[in-house]
C-alpha cells in the first residue's frame, strides 16, 4: 500500500496538561497506577477493537491487535510530539505498514506511541465518541466489568450503562458519523463521501475537524434519536445538564447542576497522580449509580464531545444553549478563538480570561464557565419551579374556579341532559378557593361568601345542542311537567331579508342611532340585543355603543363591576353576556361544559360549545388582558371574564329577556322564552309574509316612539350645558 496514511491528531488538554507535567519530568501514564497484567489485558482488548480505526486500513489489523505491547514510552518534550506528527504526515509510519504481514511483532511500536497519545483513557473516549457503542463486544464488556482498578472501574460502569441504554449501532451508521464530521469542516456535501472512499480522504477530513482534540470541555448536550432512526450528531439537547466538568469517560454522565467541581483542589503542575485523582473526584460527584446518573431519556445516545478550541463549535454551543447571555466578556473571548498551533498560544489567550495564575488556565476557564452555567442553571431552576406552580394554578375551573349553588329544594333535571345529580347538592354556603391567573402572577385571596336566601324559580330552563339543533327544555317545578322548544336557526336568507328590511325601513336605523347616543329603554335595548346576529355590521356597531353607555351607567350605580366596563369598551365576547352579573354565574362541577346562571326567579343551565377552561383567557391580547385583570375586584369577576370568552355563540340562545325580567322585577313580554316577542318569528322565516312584516314594523315604530318620549327636551339639554359650563369655570378658578 503506497498511499500516505493520515492519522487522526490526538491532543490532550484541559485540567490535565501533559506538557506541564512533562516539563517537570513527571510521569503522566495511567498504566503506572494499575497492575501490569490488568493493563496488558485491557490494552490488548482495546487495541483489538480500536486498531481497525486507528491504523486506518492496515492489512494486518487483527494480528496487530494481538501483539504483545511494550510499556508506553513517554515523549521527551512537546517538540518530539510535533516532530513525530510531521513524520506521520510525510508517510513515515506508512512505510511500516507497507511491510508484509509476517513482520516481527517486536518491531511494531505501541499504537499509542505512534499517535502521540500519553493518556490512553482519554484516547478511548475519543474512539467511543467517533464510533458510539458499535465497538462494544460481549467479551470486552465482561472483562471490563471485572476490572477493579480505579481508572477503569468508572470506564467500565459508564460503558456498561451506555451499552444497556442503547443497543449497538451498525457499522454503516458509524461511517455516516465520520463522513458527517468530515463534511462539517470542509462544507462538503455528505454525498461526496461514501463507504468506498479512500481511508486517507476520510481520515484527513476527520483530522481537520479537530474531533479528536481537547476532550476536556464537552459543550454539546445529549443527542436524541430522530423518528427516522438517523442520528443528528449536531443537535443539542438539555443545555441545563452541561454545568458539570469532566475530562474522562468517568465524567460523561450528567450530574446535578447544583454541584460543581471542587475548586482549587487540583494543580497539575504539582501532582503526579493528577488524572487518577480527578477520576476519583468525578466518581464521587457523579455517584455512578445507574439510577441517579442517567438523567436523559431512553431515546438519547452518547453525547457528542465537542472540542473546546474549535471556535465554530464553541461559539455555536454558547449561542444555542443561551447560557452566556449575561457574560459578554466570556463570549468575546470565545469569539476570539482561532486555530491554535500549539498549547503555548492557547495558554496566552486563556490567561486573559482567568483570575488566578496558580491554577491551570484551561482548568480555571472551565471553572469560570461552570460558575456562569451554575448561576444560569439556578435561574433556570427557579423559572422551572415557577412554571410548575403556574401549571398547577392554571385556570382550571374543575378545581379552582368552580362555584356551587345549593338549595334546600332539589332541582329536578331532565334525563336527556348531559349533566346529572345536581339534586344531591344541598347546603347554604358557597365555598371558594384561591384563584391564580396563568402567566400574570395575579392572586386573588380567598373570599368566603355569606349565605344568601334563594327563592326557587317556577321553571328551570335547560339549553343544549342535539343533532345540530339548539333545544330548550323548560321544566315546571310546580306541576312537574316539561316541554322542549326548538330554537330557530339563522340562515343566509334570513340575513338577506333583514338587510333589505333595514334599507327599506328607516325606523330601524333611527332607533339604533338613538340607542347609541344613550337615549334608551331597557326593554327596547334587550329586544334589539336578542336580534343582534341578524343585523348588518353597521347596526351591530350602534348596538355596541348603546351597550357601552348602559354598562357605564350601571357601573356608576354599583350594579356592575368595572371589569364589565373594560370588556364592553374592548367588545369582547358575546354582546348579550355583558348584561349578566358576575355573581349570578356558576359552573356545574359534574360537567364543565355547563354554566348555571341563576338569580331570584330565574334558573338556567346553558351548554357551552367546549369545556370551560381558564387558558382560553390567554386568547385575548396582553394589553386587554391586563386591563381586565386590573379592573377585576372579586373572584366572580375573574370567572365572568373566563366565561365571557368561552361562551362563544351559545349566548345567542340564552333567554336574556327572561333573565333581565327577573333582575328588574318587571314583566317585559308575554311568556315566550325563545323570542322577545311573537312578531320576531317573521325574521327567521324564509317565506315572505306581508302581515308579519307589517306587525314587525309596527313593533319597531312603537319602540322608536318610546325612545322619543324618554329623550330629554331642549330645555333640559340647555340646563345640562349650563351646569357643565359652571362646573368648568369653578374648576378653573380652583386651579388658579
From Swiss-Prot:
The gene is meu27. Keywords: Meiosis. GO terms for biological process: meiotic cell cycle. It comes from the Eukaryota. This is Meiotic expression up-regulated protein 27. Pfam families: UPF0300. InterPro entries: Meiotic_expression. Belongs to the UPF0300 family.
